[in-house]
A protein has these predicted regions:
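Short amphipathic alpha-helix used as the core "switch/output" element in two-component signaling
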Residues: 43, 58, 63-80, 97
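Two-component/phosphorelay signaling modules centered on CheY-like receiver
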Residues: 15-33
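Active-site beta3 strand of CheY-like receiver
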Residues: 48-54, 59, 84
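AAA+ ATPase active-site-proximal loops
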Residues: 137-171
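Short hydrophobic/Thr-rich beta-strand motif most characteristic of the beta2 strand and flanking loop
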Residues: 29-38, 44
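A Lys-centered signature of the CheY-like receiver
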Residues: 101, 109, 149
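C-terminal output helix
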Residues: 91-93, 107, 111-120
Length: 171
């Protein structure tokens, strides 16, 4: 998967920050989509998931919908999608809360272009590895076949199918 096909969704209500992030990433060959508010961001996400999302924690100063709500929305659709949360008013609790909800990284403004690119490149690589891992797991799971159609074999097959989709360890 080359970098040209990687699509990044940048969500920030601050036009200058949004354009700066977009410019840095475009210069490195990424395809960029932008959103400036909650409603627009949800529309973009529902239209097509990006490879990585960069979301400002504090959006829509007039409303109560913010970047955390967008993070939660994305994770319901695709738990593996890397989301980088950014904030100009960050504190440790905000960072911890974001990471607990599934954020890939948390960056405080201002940040260097090197740090931004590092996080985005790692996010893209992480997503690629998770997709490959799922593909290989599916291939492995489907390469073993049970012979028979008895009630017990069917129950075992159903149970294995459910267990194979779980993120946690099964003992």
């Amino acid at each position: 998967q080359n970098i040209m096909s990687n699509e990044i969704l940048v969500i920030d209500d601050n036009t200058d920050i949004r354009l700066l992030i977009s410019s840095i990433l475009k210069d490195k060959g990424f395809t960029i989509r932008e959103s400036s508010n909650f409603v627009q961001a949800i529309e973009e996400i529902n239209k097509k998931l990006p490879d990585v999302a960069i979301i400002d924690v504090k959006l829509d100063k007039k409303g109560d919908k913010d970047g955390i709500d967008i993070l939660t929305h994305i994770k319901k659709i695709d738990a593996d999608l890397p989301v980088i949360m950014i904030s100009g008013h960050a504190n440790v609790q905000m960072a911890v809360d974001s990471l607990k909800l599934g954020a890939f990284e948390f960056m405080q403004k201002p940040f260097s272009s090197e740090r931004l690119l590092n996080f985005v490149n790692r996010g893209v690589e992480n997503l690629k590895l998770k997709k490959e891992n799922k593909k290989l797991n599916d291939k492995l799971f489907h390469s073993y076949e049970f012979i028979g159609e008895s009630y017990m074999i069917t129950k075992i097959r159903d149970l294995m199918s459910k267990l194979s989709k779980m993120e946690s360890r099964v003992f």
